[in-house]
Structure formats: C-alpha cells, structure tokens
C-alpha cells in the first residue's frame, strides 16, 4: 500500500464534499484513522499486512481506528471495497458492532455532506452487512431510509430510493424479521409513491407499488400499529389500482388482510408513533425545525423562513413536504411551559406560515387535513391538548389580520366533519367537539365568540358554523331555530385534490379514500341532532347569555350566580332561549303545559300515555318537532346529578334514585317493550340520541327496577329480573349503524367516567345478562381494571370464586393477555390476578411466552414465572421457553434462566432430556432423536433455532457455574452430552469460538467420530492447558457433586452467584418506568 502523503491526500476529498465550513470532529476522526492506517501498512505484503493488523486489533483503541480506516476505504474506493470488507470481517472483535454504530451516526449527521461515490458505497456496504446477517443493521437501515426525502425528485434522491428498494426486495426475509422496520418501510414507500406520479417515474412507481402492496398484505399485522397516519397517506395513492383494491378489502373484507383486523376505524383509533412521523424528515430538516421552534424569537423569524423556503421548497414537487412538517410539529414538538411563556416563535405561527406560503392547491388541501387530523379522533382521556392547540390558535390569531386564513380553515373544519368518513360521522363529530371542549377547559383561548361571531366571516359561513357548532355558538336571536333539512351546499362533499398519473394534473376525489363510492352509498345521511356529550366531559366556564330576548327563558340566569357546581347540561340551558310555541291538540297540549310547569314524574306519565293514544294523523311534523324539543329541554334540566346513586341500597333510596322524568319514560318502555307505541318510541329514540347519558341511565334503571320488583315479590328471578331485552329493543329502534354490542361499550365507557361506583355495581348484571357481548370483551375489561383499586379487585375475585361472575374464558384469554401488555402496571397486575381467579390453565395461553420482552413486559413475565413454578417441564413448555430471543449479549434472558434453575431442583434429569432432544432435532444428520421432532405447524413456527438454544444454555451455564454447582448436573446427562457433541460438529467456526466454554462441558468419546473430527480442529480435546479448560474441568466436577446432592441443598446453593453471572444485579439503579398509554408530550 502507498503510504505517501500524496496518496492520503487523494482520499481526503472522496468521502465528504469539500466546503468552506471547518471540518468537525466526526470528519477528522475518519481522516486521522485513514492516515494512520496508511502509514502503518505502507509497503507490506498481504501476509505481513494481516499479521500486523491481527496483532494490532487486540487492543481496543487500535481496533476502533483500524475499523474506521477500513470503512473509510470501502466508502471511497469501490474497486478495493470487496477485499477491504473481507479484511474488516476477519479483523472485527465485536461482530462489526462498532462499525454499524458509527455508520448509523455518520448517516444521521453527515449524509448530506457525503460525495456521490460515498453514498453509492454506503448502499453497497448496507447490502453486504445484511447479506452476512450482521447484527443491529436495522438501525443503520432506518437512518439511511430517513434520507429518502419526501417531495424530492432529484437524481440523487431517486437513486437512493431505487437502491433501498433493490436491497429490501432482495433481502425481504431479513426485512420481515423486524416488525418496526417492516412498518417503517411500508410507511416510507407509501409516502414516496405520492411523489412519483410523473411519466419519468413509471417504472420506479410500478416497482414500488408491487413491493409495498406485497409487504402490506403479507405483513398486515405489522402494519396495524402504523395507525391513523397510515390511512392519511393511503388516501393520496388511492387511485392506483392496487391501492384501490387494498382500500376495498380494508372497507368490506378486513378479515382477509388479518384475522384480528376489524376495519378502517380500528386504524383511525390507533395513534401513530411519533417515530414514524420523524422518519419522514431528514435529520438535517429536523435539526432546522427544532432550531426554529426553540431559538428564534417571534418577530425575527422571517429571514429564517425565507432561507428555509429557498432551501427546501424550491420546486413544485417539494410542496408535499409541508404536510410532513405540519404533522411532525404538531405531534413531536411540544414546548415546555417556560417556552410557551417566552418570546420564542410559537408553533401556530410556523404552521400558519407553511399554510399561507403554499402555492399548490393539492398540498394546501392535504395540509389543512394534516392540521386538523387529530381533532377528528380526539379523546380527552387519552389524547394530548398539544395536538389540537395549533389548529385553534392559527384561526384565532389570524381572524383579525388574515381573515381569509381563518375563513378557509373554519369552512374546511365544517365540511370535513360530514365528508371525511360518512359512516362514522357521529364519531368524527364527537372527536371535533371533544377538541373544542378541551380547548375551552384548558383555556387555550378565552372563548369561541371572537372566532365564530367575527364580522369578517361571510353570512353563508356563519350559518354553517351555527348549524355545525350549535353548542358553541351564541344564537343570533331569541327564537330557537329548529334544525331543518340539510342544505344542498352542506351535503356537497368537500373535494380533495390528488396528483394524477401525469404529476401536475389535479384529480378531484372525496377525502380521504374512505369516500369510495360504494362506501358512501352505504353511509347514512347526517343527523341534525345535537352531538353526544357526557356532563362531566366538559367543565369549561361559559359566559351567561346576554342577548336581550322577547320571550322569557325557562331558567333565569339571575338566579344562579355561580354555575361551576351545576351539571353542564343545565349550564348550557342557561344560554338557550325559549322554544317557539306551536299549537297542539287540546288534551296533549294541557299535559305538555303541566309537564313544562311541574317538570315531575307524575306529570310526565300522563303526557306519555296521551301521546301513545294519539292517532297517526293527529300531529304534523312541526308539532312533533315542537313536542320533542320541549320534552328534551325538560329532560336535560331534570337530569340527576352524580349524587343520585345512593351509598345505601335500601328500597327507599333506590326508588328515590329513579324518581326523575327520564326514568318515567323507561318505566313505560319496561312495561310495554315491543308493544310500545310508535310515537312514544320515537320520543325515546330522540331522547337517547340527544342526551348522551340516557343510554347508561337505562341500564341503571333496569337494574334498580328489577331489584325493587324482585324484593316486593320476594324473588330475584322471573319477569322482575334485569330485562336485557328492553335495552335491545331501544338499541334496535335507534337510527344508528352501531350494533347493540357497540352501544353497550359506549354506554359503559360513559358510565365509568361519570360514576365509577355505579359502573362497578351494574357490571355483574351486564356480564350475566349480556354474556355474548361481555364475555372476553377487551374494551370493557380495560375499563374495569383501569378504574378499580385493591378493595374493588378483592370484591371481584370473591364474586368469581363464588361462581357469580365470569369475565373471560379459555377461548379469549390469549387475545386479552396480548392487549393487556400495553396497560399500566397495576392494570396488568389486576389482569393476572383475574386470570388466576378464573383458574385458566397455563397451557391455554403459553403460546405468548416467546412474544414477551424482558424490558417491556416485566409484569407478564413475573406472573408467568410464578405459574411455571407449579408446572412440570414438558416438551412444549421447554420449546416455547427456549424460543425466546436473547435480548442482552452478556446478561441473557433472566426469565428463562430462572425457570430452568427452578426446575433443576426437582426435574433436572427430565429437563436435560427435553433440552437435549430439542437441541439434537436442530441437526437432522445422524440424529438418533430425529423421529422425535414435533410435526405440528404451530410448533414449527416458534421452534427455537440452534443459535437460540446454545445462547440460552450458555447463559444458564454462566449463572450456575459458581457456588455449589447447582444446575450443572443438567450437562452431565448422557443425552445432553451427545447433543452438545453433535452441536459442536455442526456449528460454524464462529459458533465454536462463541460457545467454546459450553462445548467444553461435553465429555470425550474415544469411539465417536464426532470427537474425532473435533480432535482435528485447532481447539483439540487434550487435557486442559489454559484457564478456560481448567474452569471447564472444575465445572464438570462441580456438576457431578451437585447431581448427587438432594434438592434442598441445590435450592440453597442456587442463591449464590458470581459477579459475572448472567443474573440481574439488584443493587444497580432501577430502570425508568416503562411508558404505556402516555400522551405525546411525555
């Protein structure tokens, strides 16, 4: 090799583009390493070269510098790259761990400065690392994938995308081993396809579509965690035939994609990890955005924005990057309170700039959706206010100086509510209403009046706002406006624009692709009723009505000085004017007037009886509307507060708790059920639709009424029991797409938020009367474990033990346990307590053992460990245990080690036979146990590899080689000896080196051809001549001694461990608590 200074200087310009910027430490590190390498190896022959490097890499410092130098040569000299890579693999001491870590850092920080040759060679090196199964390459692949920027169709970016596509297509099997990487690749390429609609990209787009569709369909279980952001991306490519068919399957045949997939709404309810959003920005752009949001003062941002505009938005195609930036800013950048109080530029100002500077109608429509996307599915119990804050602040601060921005955003918000997903319009409406309620509750803005009642809004938009957000708008006059039929303009779907096959062509399409014609035809028309809210969801302070009216209201505002203690439904009524009176038949009008005056049960019952006896032609539509609105108004005013649920369940207390007008209507339904008059049923439907708490109050009434009737007749059964059919009749009458099961889940969810004690009181009856819905219901079970304390848990377990309550059975336990892995720690502890209370055998859910991760699922692992202590080792249990991945190179899997050591105290010989048979089955050649291998496909899917088996045995050996030798008797059994010998014979050189101490435990067999072959290796099987062999001899002697001891002594000895044991060091600092259902700001 040439060691001259000229040769070294020749390489200096080949890795990084030369700029006027001073080299940083990262660049200098590679330069120094290469120069030192050249000086050391100049003029050496190949033999001397390898001998010298082999001696140098034994030292940590030299090993790192030589590795960097070889990487430098690979990235700068394509002709010598294959030979240099071979040298690198021969000289590495850590399985190329140092190399992959430094390459990942290089890509993240310096990729934009790499030369074209360096970028090309980086892809070549990534391909070689994947081909040779090097560990931890996934992080490097993820960093390179981030560099494939959206909105960039430059030759360099397209070459990178094509290179990555080639690698992932060629090494598909490697890709599918990593669930997160599968999701990232699918998410990335669906986003990139959006930019490749130009005619010059036809071939590339076809390859991308073929690859990503295949990946999505084959690995849809890994796609589900991508959540709602993936749906947003899919809408932009929905016109491609392959994606159109995927949409049809997701909408109409979801089970064909994945047995556990229930449809698009399941994805929309799943929050997308911010890591996927972060992956769609290059590290360079991410650093610039972080600088803009944390260092630039408000008012000084223009020059930074101009620079950013010129650098990243300088082509028509680059405009699509705006949506990625908006989603990242909303979901990933959550400023602290100190920053919010400072003069740093706020997020809403940056988003406002991204919207106003957009020049492409397609991108602008998608950017609006990106801004409001979290609003559509907002759940105050789970979602973060920081995700909806920018949207309201952009409109609020723009209404004065930039009214056009606020008007277009308000118009978009009104239309997207009805047209985003017509089938679930009510859920979208609830999400947006929840967002506004949370905004007012957290006082993000004082109130909505300056925005919704601004004089700068045109008349049509104001009318649309009052119709869509009636609960938040101040009425224009004192007369209550009955919701009429939908206006033609309101029913016209807001059209989204998508790039057509020609790139610049704009194609109108309903947003998102959920608006497939067949899907829209199946959807129902928008309801004009008020949205559903529980009274305790929103406690924002509202201003008393100040509008002067000619009609007196039913409740006087001056009688209430402080409305904080009133239910929200009553507070709303303080702001609403009286209902315009309509003439009714005399008898019916008299009962209605009396009910409006008295607002009592005794006046409501005659009204219902009179209404039921009215003829078909007795009332017209206007009269029906007036009657319905009047009754609902009183029902809302007389809703019981939280205290109506009595602490003492005496007959008097229970009777008093259902002495409200709403329960009078339920009493009539209870008596008549299917024979209930049509007009009365229509009124009940309107009440349940407009009063969100009415659903669970029916459940409460059914329990109380049945209980009271049963006590009076001295029986708890028969016709006086909890009549579940009444609830079903009312659910069937609702003009809703929700099934009875979904109605139950919604009502129980509201009930749990409203009154936990009532929820727990009703729940046993729900499990008994709605067994088909409630049994194995993970949604309700999550509500249950999320609201109970230790006393409640004890009561539930008592009921289960007495046979009064069954929450789940063996058929649904696996799905329940899998979903519980995301619960909080106490919730998981409750789940496992309930599993034991139900006496569910371990064999029904043992299949989840390989899926559990030591660092993420400690609760489940400890519970299963305690259950395994009561089990005897079986072939299936041992197979599942040893199929677990070893997460730590040094510590191994403490769960597996603990189970094996415990079993060794009593079942050492049996355990040895099982493990030996499993290990032998991995090597079919000359295997005496070949016929014993399991044949079931389910077992083959989780069968451990030989590498996993040897890893677990090695860590087990380390854990028990000290002390009194407890557990080492596992290795002295004849079957295990033969298995280790056979494993040694079929192992590669690297495996023999890695597990040398383990193989050393196998005794010599003079007649065995296996040992003969081993004798020819460089290791030899002679008397121990080094420390390792001496340790092996001692371990074998200790094993023999331990095998002769009784189990009690073995148990005592099992507590002794050495410092380098694979068991956990309990004195070290505890790991941070695992985060589960946390908000994004955390």
Curated annotation (Swiss-Prot):
InterPro entries: HEAT_Ints3_C, INTS3, INTS3_N. The keyword Transmembrane helix does not apply. Pfam families: HEAT_Ints3_C, Ints3_N. Keywords: Cytoplasm, Nucleus. GO terms for cellular component: cytoplasm; nucleus. Residues 483-563, 923-945, 1005-1082 are annotated as: Disordered. It comes from the Eukaryota. Residues 936-945 have a biased composition (Polar residues). Coiled coil: none annotated. It is found in: Nucleus; Cytoplasm. Residues 517-528, 542-555, 1008-1018, 1033-1056 have a biased composition (Low complexity). Belongs to the multiprotein complex Integrator. The core complex associates with protein phosphatase 2A subunits, to form the Integrator-PP2A (INTAC) complex. Belongs to the Integrator subunit 3 family. Component of the integrator complex, a multiprotein complex that terminates RNA polymerase II (Pol II) transcription in the promoter-proximal region of genes. The integrator complex provides a quality checkpoint during transcription elongation by driving premature transcription termination of transcripts that are unfavorably configured for transcriptional elongation: the complex terminates transcription by (1) catalyzing dephosphorylation of the C-terminal domain (CTD) of Pol II subunit Polr2A/Rbp1 and Spt5, and (2) degrading the exiting nascent RNA transcript via endonuclease activity. This is Integrator complex subunit 3 homolog. The lineage of its organism: Eukaryota, Metazoa, Ecdysozoa, Arthropoda, Hexapoda.
């Amino acid at each position: 090799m040439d060691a001259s200074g000229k040769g070294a200087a020749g390489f200096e310009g080949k890795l990084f583009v030369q700029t006027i910027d001073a080299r940083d430490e990262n660049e200098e590190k590679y330069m120094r390493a290469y120069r030192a390498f050249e000086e050391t190896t100049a003029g050496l022959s190949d033999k001397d070269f390898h001998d010298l490097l082999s001696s140098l890499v034994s030292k940590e410092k030299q090993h790192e510098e030589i590795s960097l130098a070889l990487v430098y040569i690979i990235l700068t000299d394509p002709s010598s790259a294959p030979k240099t890579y071979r040298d690198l693999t021969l000289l590495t001491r850590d399985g190329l761990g140092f190399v992959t870590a430094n390459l990942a850092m290089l890509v993240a920080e310096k990729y934009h400065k790499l030369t074209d040759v360096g970028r090309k060679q980086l892809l070549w090196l990534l391909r070689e690392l994947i081909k040779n199964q090097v560990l931890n390459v996934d992080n490097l692949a993820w960093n390179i994938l981030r560099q494939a920027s959206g909105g960039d169709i430059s030759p360099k970016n397209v070459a990178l995308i094509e290179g990555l596509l080639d690698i992932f297509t060629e090494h598909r099997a490697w890709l599918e081993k990593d669930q997160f990487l599968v999701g990232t690749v699918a998410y990335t390429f669906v986003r990139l396809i959006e930019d490749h609609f130009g005619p010059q990209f036809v071939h590339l787009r076809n390859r991308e579509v073929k690859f990503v569709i295949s990946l999505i369909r084959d690995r849809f279980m890994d796609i589900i965690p991508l959540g709602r952001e993936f749906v947003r991306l899919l809408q932009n490519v929905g016109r491609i035939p392959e994606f159109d068919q995927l949409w049809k399957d997701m909408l109409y045949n979801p089970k064909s994609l994945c047995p556990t997939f229930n449809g698009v709404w399941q994805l929309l309810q799943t929050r997308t990890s911010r890591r996927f959003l972060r992956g769609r920005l290059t590290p360079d752009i991410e650093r610039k955005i972080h600088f803009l949001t944390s260092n630039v003062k408000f008012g000084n941002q223009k020059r930074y924005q101009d620079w950013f505009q010129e650098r990243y938005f300088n082509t028509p195609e680059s405009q699509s990057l705006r949506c990625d930036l908006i989603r990242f800013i909303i979901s990933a950048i959550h400023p602290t309170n100190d920053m919010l109080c400072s003069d740093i530029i706020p997020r809403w100002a940056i988003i406002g700039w991204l919207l106003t500077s957009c020049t492409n109608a397609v991108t602008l429509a998608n950017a609006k959706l990106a801004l409001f996307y979290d609003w559509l599915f907002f759940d105050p119990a789970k979602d973060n206010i920081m995700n909806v804050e920018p949207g309201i602040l952009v409109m609020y601060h723009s209404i004065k100086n930039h009214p056009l921005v606020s008007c277009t955003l308000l118009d978009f918000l009104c239309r997207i509510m009805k047209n985003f997903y017509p089938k679930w319009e009510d859920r979208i409406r609830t999400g947006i209403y929840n967002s506004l309620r949370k905004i007012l509750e957290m006082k993000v803005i004082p109130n909505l009046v300056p925005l919704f009642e601004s004089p700068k809004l045109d008349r049509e938009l104001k009318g649309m706002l009052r119709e869509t957000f009636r609960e938040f708008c101040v009425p224009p006059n004192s007369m209550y406006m009955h919701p009429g039929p939908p206006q033609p303009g309101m029913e016209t779907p807001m059209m989204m624009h998508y790039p057509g096959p020609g790139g610049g062509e704009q194609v109108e399409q309903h947003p998102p692709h959920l608006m497939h014609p067949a899907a829209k035809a199946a959807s129902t028309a928008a309801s004009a009723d008020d949205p559903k809210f529980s009274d305790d969801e929103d406690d924002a302070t509202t201003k008393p009505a100040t509008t002067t009216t000619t009609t007196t209201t039913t409740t006087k505002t001056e009688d209430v000085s402080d409305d904080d203690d009133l239910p929200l439904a009553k507070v709303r009524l303080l702001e609403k004017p009286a209902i315009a009176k309509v003439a009714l038949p005399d008898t019916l009008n008299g009962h209605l007037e009396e009910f409006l005056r008295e607002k009592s049960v005794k006046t409501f019952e005659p009204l219902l009886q009179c209404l039921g006896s009215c003829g078909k032609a007795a009332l017209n539509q206007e009269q029906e509307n007036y009657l319905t609105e009047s009754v609902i108004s009183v029902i809302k005013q007389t809703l019981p507060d939280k205290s109506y649920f009595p602490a003492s369940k005496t007959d008097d207390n229970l009777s008093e708790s259902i002495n409200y007008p709403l329960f009078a209507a339920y009493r009539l339904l209870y008596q008549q059920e299917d024979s209930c008059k049509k007009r009365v049923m229509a009124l009940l439907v309107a009440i349940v639709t407009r009063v969100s708490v009415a659903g669970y109050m029916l459940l409460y009434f059914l329990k109380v009424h049945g209980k009271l009737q049963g006590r009076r007749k001295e029986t708890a059964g028969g016709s006086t029991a909890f009549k579940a059919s009444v609830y079903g009749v009312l659910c069937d009458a609702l003009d809703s797409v929700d099934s009875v099961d979904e109605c139950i889940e919604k009502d129980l969810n509201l009930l749990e938020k409203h009154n936990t004690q009532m929820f727990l009181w009703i729940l046993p009856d729900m499990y008994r009367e709605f067994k088909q819905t409630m049994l194995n219901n993970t949604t309700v079970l999550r509500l249950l474990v999320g609201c109970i304390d230790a006393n409640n848990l004890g009561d539930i377990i008592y009921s289960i033990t007495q046979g009064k309550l069954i929450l789940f059975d063996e058929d649904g336990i696996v799905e329940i346990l899998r979903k519980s892995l995301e619960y909080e720690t106490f919730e998981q502890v409750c789940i496992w307590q309930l599993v034991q209370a139900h006496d569910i055998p371990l064999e029904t859910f043992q299949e989840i053992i390989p899926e559990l991760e030591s660092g993420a699922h400690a609760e489940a692992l400890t519970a299963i460990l305690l259950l395994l202590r009561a089990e005897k080792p079986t072939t299936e249990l041992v197979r599942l245990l040893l199929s677990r991945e070893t997460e730590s190179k040094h510590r191994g899997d403490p769960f597996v080690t603990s189970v094996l050591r415990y079993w060794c105290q009593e079942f050492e010989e049996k355990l040895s036979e099982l493990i030996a048979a499993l290990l032998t089955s991995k090597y079919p050649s000359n295997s005496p146990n070949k016929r014993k291998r399991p044949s079931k496909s389910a077992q083959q899917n989780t069968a451990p590899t030989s590498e996993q088996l040897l890893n677990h045995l090695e860590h087990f050996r380390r854990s028990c080689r000290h002390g009194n030798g407890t557990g080492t008797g596992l290795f002295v059994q004849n079957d295990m000896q033969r298995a280790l010998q056979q494993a040694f014979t079929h192992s590669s050189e690297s495996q023999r080196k890695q597990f040398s101490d383990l193989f050393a435990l196998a005794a010599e067999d003079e007649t065995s051809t296996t040992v003969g072959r081993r004798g020819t290796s460089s290791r030899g099987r002679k008397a121990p001549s080094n420390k390792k062999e001496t340790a092996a001899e001692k371990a074998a002697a200790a094993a023999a001694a331990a095998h002769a001891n009784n189990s009690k002594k073995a148990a005592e000895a099992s507590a002794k461990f050495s410092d380098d044991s694979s068991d956990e060091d309990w004195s070290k600092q505890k790991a941070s608590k695992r985060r589960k259902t946390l908000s994004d700001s955390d």
